[in-house]
From Swiss-Prot:
Protein name per its UniProtKB record: Small ribosomal subunit protein uS8
GO terms (BP aspect): translation
One example GO MF annotation: rRNA binding
A GO cellular component entry from the record: ribosome
Described function: One of the primary rRNA binding proteins, it binds directly to 16S rRNA central domain where it helps coordinate assembly of the platform of the 30S subunit.
Membrane-spanning parts: none
Entry keyword set: Ribonucleoprotein, Ribosomal protein, RNA-binding, rRNA-binding
Annotated source species: Aliivibrio salmonicida (strain LFI1238) (Vibrio salmonicida (strain LFI1238))
PROSITE patterns xrefs: RIBOSOMAL_S8
InterPro entries in alphabetical order: Ribosomal_uS8, Ribosomal_uS8_CS, Ribosomal_uS8_sf
Subunit-structure text: Part of the 30S ribosomal subunit. Contacts proteins S5 and S12.
A Pfam family reported for this protein in Swiss-Prot or TrEMBL: Ribosomal_S8
Similarity field: Belongs to the universal ribosomal protein uS8 family.
Amino acid sequence: MSMQDPISDMLTRVRNGQSANKVAVKMPSSKLKVAIAALLKAEGYIADFAVEGDIKPELEITLKYFQAKQVIEQIQRVSRPGLRVYKKNDALPSVMGGLGIAVISTSKGLMSDRAARKAGLGGEIICYVA
């Protein structure tokens, strides 16, 4: 069976892994998933990530905890295949009053809402992370 929304699957695996206190989660890899993982690592939401395998690459995300609590409290898909959500740079959302991030797909690549606002770019809102 083919996967209809691989990004939602990735976010669900991370959410479920954190709920079950897993050390790491594995999933099929893609360029967009690796870019999202790199952004989450840069923002401090995950400990590390690695791509393993050549024929069928797998993305392994090492989850992060602080004092035995999840670092990611909320991770939510916004734009989905049935309803794409685009915003201009002046209408980009602020997640939890700036405590969280919105992952934005812009013409210059994937970036957080703060970086997109600073660069004056809008784009597709992939997900919210807090």
